Amino acid sequence: MKLYNIVFSPTGGTKKVADCLTSALEGEVTTVDLTDSKLDFDSISLTKEDAAVISVPSYGGRVPAVAAERLSQVHGNGARAVLVCVYGNRAYEDTLVELEDAAKQAGFQSIAAVAAVAEHSIARQFAAGRPDSQDAAQLSDFAKQIQHKLSENNLTEPAIPGNRPYKKAGGAGLVPKPTKECVRCGVCAQSCPVQAIDKEDPKKVDDKACISCMRCISVCPHAARKANPVMLSAVSLMLKKVCSERKECELFL
């Protein structure tokens, strides 16, 4: 059995959760980076003997559209899938059911699902430092239960919470822009999952293409990209009430 780590993780939180799970599962791991716009996703083909951990962040309670679109190009061919949604301690709403549908359309059989918490990608004070050691222990335990199901080739589908039709997707509200510290090194443009940043002039941003993933902020070696501080403060204030209380990881088998 080959194990595929199929992950969309612009700021690294989702990948940390995915790695906690895949490192505790059996099989040689092949990583498929759904943020890589240069990758030929149509060339990725699994078999029914394989398993995949498919992980995405929750953006406003939905799967990021670009992640769903790239996953649709992958050929699951009956491979078993563990669905993972990672959220910033607010709520994941319809993310898991949407991911379940996207995985099914790509030819995967969903046998388990996990909802986990990682540091909020925009308001980073919420769920700061997560996944932490407590999460890692919990995810490792989840992986053991998932491995048992994989070893038995148990193909029963988990009961996943969420709504169909899904909630309405929100637009990108925060578009990071360069500060005067920008040296036009181009790291942000190379790393942007949707190529919203001009490669010739990283100070130019396509506001309509941007998905507010905050990848450019997280990869900038000069800390020279920032979100609008007034808007960021408003978002933080709005999230404070719903994000402050610790939420735990969940397993659906």
Give residue ranges: language-model regions.
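FMN-binding flavodoxin-like domain, especially the glycine-rich phosphate-binding loop
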Residues: 2-36, 42-173, 230-236, 241-253
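Iron-sulfur cluster-binding cysteine motifs and their immediate structural context
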Residues: 178, 183-211, 215-232
